[in-house]
Amino acid sequence: MGTFGTESPLRLQVSSCLKTLSTSRDSGEIVHALRTLMRCLDDGEFTRIHHTHALQVLVSAQSSHWFSRSHDEDEEEMKKLWGEIIIRGPAEQTLLTLLDTISSTGESEALDRCVSALEMFLSAARLQVLLWSRCEVSGASADSPQLTETVIGHLAALPSITSNHLHTNTPDIFLPQQYYPLLAASILDTLEKTCHALRAGRDCSLGFVSQVLGKVCIQGYSSQMFETLGPRLSFVTREDALYQRVTQKLMENVPERCTESVITGLIRSLSGAAAVSRLMGNLVLTNKKAQFVLTHKLILQQYQHPTRLLKSVLGYLAVDSSRRPLLKQVLRSVCQVWCNSSAVKHTCVEQQLYVSKALLLCVALLDDSEIQELRQEMLQCMLGGVQCRLDSNVERIRRMGMVVGECLSHRLDTPGSQLKFQYGADEEIGELKSLMESLAVNDDEEEQPDASNSLQPEPKVEAPVSSQSVASDPGNGSESELDSDDDLTPYDMSADQEKKKSAPPRYVRDCLEGLMSSDDAERFELSLQVAETLLRKNVKATQEVSVQFSKVLLHLEDRYNTALFLSLRQNAMVALTVTDIKPVVDYWTTEFYALNYSLRQRLDILEVLALAAQELSEPVTNKHTGAEPITAVTPLGQSDDITHWRQIVDKRIQSKTRRISKGVTQPVKAVPNRYAPVAGFFFFPLFRSYDRPQTTFDLLGGDHLVLGRLLHTLGLLMHLAVNAPVVSQMGRALLDFVWAVRFHTDQMVRRGVMFAVCAVFLSMPSENLLTELGDDLMETRAWLADVAESDCDSDCRSLAVQSLMLMDKNLKSQLQIPDMET
């Protein structure tokens, strides 16, 4: 290059060519200028100094008409030469120029040709050339950090840059679904070239590639990248130690702010702890951010990941002896969280399940010596965690505590004191128990043999001695065969019933005495079975002994293991309530807060009140219709077939019947609501003593389960009283009660609170909302919005959203605010 004041021949030549391209309309001159620029591509000075300006002139020349006004042969040659300059030029400068031109150019032929040029650039594998040029140690030594950051940003955000300007006209290759796998394939090619260069004794740098990978992942496209990178890297690093080191170096050079997104995407794409160990090496020991992500964030702060990721992370910590101290550190942290009662109350069930899986996996990966070292901490974790979970009102949390407690006590191998619980099995419990099985961390999951095949014992071949021995038995001769009863048709005894010694009671008082008898089991069972029918048929007799009968049923115990005892008892209690409403309901609501009742009895009272109110609110139907005349005697086995053919014949008649006109549809006959006049008897007495703690019952204290059920029952009673005159007073009283417990720590109680609020907004007339609740509506709305956004329980959040929608709907209808058109 010449000194200041003099111009080099190359610069003069390039300036002449660019002037010709900008101003000339002669196709021959244009072709000659393009050929000259083609020859200059091999000159290092041209690529360093003049290529960017030349490319800008070429792109801007597209707005002129030298393509369309030339002869066909010249036009084809010009397009070919122009494409060669795009492809053979420095990839980095070409990419930046094309993207900047697309971003600054309006709709025109020039924009279309720039888009075509960028498509050509990507299809010609120029991304690989760009990345490899940055890996060579001498390739990027003179570039400024600002230029490097610009190139990385354009590489990572190419889909966003193009789609923001092209909108629906964006080519498919620019979309994330195609571009990022293409970029990932280019990274794989670059890593391959790096391995070859290192084997040849040349130095390489992976810093630029690591920054590109981190930039893409932090923008949210890690899954698209590692769908291509993960499986391929896992495969090639099994036998190639150099490739392992190159991949580990790639991960080490990822910027700290991008570490989490890169590590998470990588682990999700791999299929085993061994693959993670090959690709990451001891990154968890040398990088503090990676250590925080792997030992804390992915395990304790996030819970959306699949179980496979937990297995990979914890297996990665366990597969190498230098990383096993971190596994014990993780176990200690998980134990502290799992036995923390505050965490049980303030975290969602899904996160507690995730932490429980992590705890079981950690324990399964420890050897016996490590178990003995951590035995005391694990024992405290087991006892504290099981206790606080058994105190929960959420069934999933209780069962989770039982399963984990059993697994931990079995692993600790405490002689004579292993925990054992009774619970129903489901898929979640089966998954938790399966985590305690021995985990193979030295092989990838896809390389392990099928467990179902390897664990099955070989079938035992047994000689058919039984049939032969029977045939050769000397005791079974011809005489025994002649005397056999096998040819006789057995008598059908399926419909036989056991003959009862006692007859079922026919009067209400006899039924009551039968339930009170403690020495005759058969009489007790018969009395309980017919109790509901007798109570509903004999109204007068029932009303005479309704309170006494209610007392007997409330204290009734299943002394004889009667079939369907709970349902028969509950049905009888409901029948008493709907038959003699006021005295029985007064008895239920009074005894609910009385002393010396178990929680089960109090819950039974709430269930009976809810079922009775539901029955009273439904229309009365004639359940006992007269017997239909018998037209023919039908064998038992043919009744279903005849009914089936009757339906077919009726359908055929209906389909072939022609109707000239249809009569007026009869309106639904109005029937009185039996619940509306007595709704107050069910509802208001339940508020009588809720804030008065007793020796055996503290509703606002430790008896969270009853409080949650009470709130659900009050909400149901409120909803069934819709259109009743007393519904506004009920809504006001229920909201006052809810307001006192709206910040309760128990999830069951908060669900009941949300259910009750929904019931209020569903049942109260909209015109009464502003009148009765005007002062508290805004505060209630702010509270519901906070619950919908930040509550740890998904059901509470869902109910809060529904309550907000109902409130807004009622207020809009009352204030007559039209919906905004979108």
UniProtKB/Swiss-Prot annotation:
InterPro entries noted in UniProt: TEL2_C_sf (IPR038528), TEL2_Regulation (IPR051970), Telomere_length_regulation_dom (IPR019337)
Keywords, A to Z, come to: Cytoplasm, Membrane, Nucleus
Could you name the domain of life of the organism this protein comes from?
Eukaryota
What protein name does the entry list? Telomere length regulation protein TEL2 homolog
Membrane-crossing segments per the record: none
Q: Which family does it belong to?
A: Belongs to the TEL2 family.
Principal location listed in the UniProt entry: cytoplasm
Q: Which organism is it from?
A: Danio rerio (Zebrafish)
Q: Where in the cell is it found?
A: Cytoplasm; Membrane; Nucleus
Listed under GO biological process in this entry are:
'de novo' cotranslational protein folding; liver regeneration
**Comp. bias (Polar residues):** 465-477
Residue stretches of biased makeup (Acidic residues): 480-489
Listed Pfam families: TELO2_ARM (PF25320), Telomere_reg-2 (PF10193)
Q: Where is this region: Disordered?
A: 442-504
**Purpose:** Regulator of the DNA damage response (DDR). Part of the TTT complex that is required to stabilize protein levels of the phosphatidylinositol 3-kinase-related protein kinase (PIKK) family proteins. Promotes assembly, stabilizes and maintains the activity of TORC complexes, which regulate cell growth and survival in response to nutrient and hormonal signals. May be involved in telomere length regulation.
Per the record, what is one GO cellular component? membrane
Gene Ontology molecular function terms on file: Hsp90 protein binding; telomeric DNA binding
